[in-house]
Each structure stands twice: as structure tokens, then as C-alpha cells.
């Protein structure tokens, strides 16, 4: 099988549990370190699937790799190659396929609840016993509209579009606003490196969706384990459409 290409935008946003899950399933992958200067590949058909990770930047920033990534996503869509995106990655898919990505009125940082907005679609991607409330990890200040043909199936009280599917029949693209790839170590590292951002948001009176570092790290082993259980179901559904 061809490898899955994973696009990493920053040193502290690695593929985390996604890479662990792929290895457990015996699925080959390669990491494109955009933060280290790796070029964006030109041919989507060289890969079984594409995965885009998060990052502190915006898809609207004038960075050298943004438009090549968007072009690769469009090429993947045309070639029948499924794409999955985590946070910034979900925004990249939305932008590439024709939806606006804008600055949100507030940030979501930390553990936040999500609720199924399309129960039937949520069951398809998360299993028949999907609960009424899921806890997921968030760290974003932008939000996306839905691209043509997309269906959203998870929402939060602070940000409506949290997980969408573009079903192409034999494969599907999955865009997520949240981070289901987080491990306990990544959560702890992010809470430390982002402590100043958290403090600024809370001091400015924008604390509605922003948790303090101590709360982010509370029961992190159990929270991350449950998060990864949901991630495994999402990933298992997505890889059903891998090409070659």
C-alpha cells in the first residue's frame, strides 16, 4: 500500500495518537515536516491518503506552504484520495474546497464538550453507542464554514462546526476543529508552551472557552485515553477509503 502523508506544521504539533494508531494497524505513513522546510509533494496520487495536523498559524496567513497544501487537497479530491484534518488541518480542507475560514469571536482552549448535530452521521463515524456529550481537546481561534457537499455532525456551544464529512461514495474527507490526536504528553507540553496565551485571554475577559493550565492537565491520562478511543473510531472509518 502507498503511504499516508502526514503534514506537520510546527515542532509541537506532531501526529501524536494518529501515528500510533496507524502503526498499530500496520498502515504505512510518512511525515512531511513543513516546519523543517520539507516541500509540499506535488502529486496526491502518490499517497493512499493525506492527513493535515494543527498549528498556531491561520490558513489565511501568507505562508509559503498554505497554497501548495490547498492545491494538493484539491488534487486529492479529484484523484479519489481521502483527506483528514485536525484543527488547522480541518480549516485547510474547508478553505481548499471553497469555504471561508475566519477569526472566531473567541478562542476554545482546553477540554470542551461536543454534541452530535447529526446523530445518524455521528453514529456512522463514532459507532452506534455515541453519547449525547463527548469531551474533546481544543486549541483554536479561527472557525470555518462548511464546503459544498459537507455535513457537520459535531458541534460545541461556542463553535458550531466541529466535525464535517464530505462523502464521495468510495471515500470521504473528514475535517475536525478539535484535536483527537492528543496524548497526555502533548497536552502537558501544550499547556506549558501556551500558558502565556491562556493568561492573556483570561485577563482580557475572554475566558468562556479558555481553561487554566491546571484544569487542562487535571485527570489528563483518563481524558486523553477516552479521547483516543473516539479518535480510533474516526480513523477506522476514514481509512476505509484509502486509495491503493
Where do the protein language model's features map onto the residues?
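C-terminal and late-domain segments of enzyme folds
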Residues: 153, 159-244
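Short, glycine/charged-enriched secondary-structure capping and boundary segments
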Residues: 19-21, 64-67, 98-101, 150-152, ...
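Short glycine-/acidic-enriched loop or helix-start segments at secondary-structure transitions
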Residues: 15-17, 41, 61-63, 94-96, ...
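Catalytic nucleophile loop
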Residues: 76-100
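Pocket-forming structural segment of enzyme catalytic cores
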Residues: 97-185
